[in-house]
A protein has these predicted regions:
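Histidine-centered divalent metal-coordination motifs
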Residues: 75-81, 99, 175-177, 181, ...
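Active-site HxH/HxHxD metal-binding segment of metal-dependent hydrolases
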Residues: 46-52, 58-162, 243
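Metallo-beta-lactamase
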Residues: 39, 46-48, 140-153, 160, ...
């Protein structure tokens, strides 16, 4: 799939899609916002040369001066959004900004062996076969995932980022897909930069490998918040623009509620481990990476059901089973 061309979106906002070094998603939408005294870049993609060249060409094609970028705001701590942050900061001399929860998560992001150990432990207690877990996993950290630095400045929910002429970007903390995830809302137009929180065609994966007990609960609460705000035009990090962000958020919320009900029904029939729920909930021809994502998403759903009192859990000597 070819990467779309950069384009002007109006209201001093520009979109530069940058290719990614894996099958899906094939690109990330970065956004450039004119901010009176310069430019703000929202997200930057992974650290590989095609992505960097796409950004450089995008600025040139749009008639923008990349040296005017004074701030890089990253929506969340995933490599397709933050991976090139060190290079952007070094080459453009800009500030690197994220939500305050990122400060405690950067070391975890950089700790590749620790991430692998946590996933292996989780897979073991929830019944995921070791051959499925290890299939297709790189032995070393990919080059496009360099270690990242701490942000220069930390944002909190409710902050307003001044972009000139009485206009600002409101910071909305929307954890779930990732703990430090933020959306930004333009005070003048109401446009929402949604990162991965709201996507046009898929629900972002809510993985149970985060430093929080109920990532799915946090995600659903974040969706409900945006629904209540009446979000309209939405600029996501992947895919096409969304006309009604609140309606899409509701669709995603209802999808998760249905999946929760389906999984609760499966567990009610017999005590079962998470991997058995995975194999009965997803199509059988997933590739290795998608099996791992399906597993982590399923554990998030089962733990949300358990924490909300809809199912129980027993430990059978190193193997966790869920029960209705």
């Amino acid at each position: 799939m070819s990467v779309p061309a950069p384009r002007h979106l109006g209201n001093g906002i520009h979109q530069i899609p940058a290719p990614l070094p894996y099958k899906a998603p094939p690109w990330v939408n970065t956004y450039v916002v004119e901010a009176g005294d310069g430019l703000i870049l929202i997200d930057c993609g992974t650290d590989w040369e095609p992505g960097w060249q796409a950004l450089a060409r995008g600025f040139a094609d749009l008639g923008l001066d990349e040296s005017q970028v004074h701030t890089l705001i990253v929506s969340h701590l995933h490599p397709d959004h933050v991976g090139m942050s060190a290079r952007v900061v070094r080459e453009l001399g800009c500030h690197f900004v994220m939500h305050e929860r990122a400060a405690s998560l950067v070391d975890r992001y950089n700790d590749t062996p620790g991430q692998a150990r946590r996933l292996e432990t989780l897979a073991d207690v929830h019944g995921m076969p070791t051959d499925v877990l290890s299939a297709g996993r790189p032995e070393e950290r990919p080059d496009f995932m360099p270690f990242i630095e701490q942000p220069d400045h930390l944002l909190t929910d409710g902050d307003a980022i001044d972009i000139g002429e009485g206009r600002s970007l409101a910071v909305l903390h929307t954890p779930g897909h990732e703990q430090a995830h933020i959306c930004l809302r333009d005070s003048r137009t109401g446009i929402l930069f949604s990162g991965d929180h709201i996507l046009p065609r898929i629900s972002p994966v809510v993985m149970y490998n985060q430093d929080t007990a109920d990532p799915l609960g946090e995600y659903m609460t974040s969706l409900e918040r945006l629904i209540g705000m009446g979000i309209g035009l939405t600029y996501p990090a992947h895919g096409t623009l969304i006309d009604r962000g609140d309606e899409r958020a509701l669709q995603i919320l209802l999808h998760h509620r249905r999946r929760l009900s389906d999984m609760a029904e499966l567990v009610s029939r017999a005590d079962t481990d998470a991997w058995s729920v995975v194999t009965r909930s997803f199509r059988p021809n997933l590739d290795p990476t998608d099996w791992r994502l399906a597993f982590l998403e399923t554990v998030s759903h089962l733990e949300h059901l358990r924490l909300s009192g809809r199912i129980g859990q027993i430990d059978t000597g190193g193997r966790i089973l869920y029960q209705g």
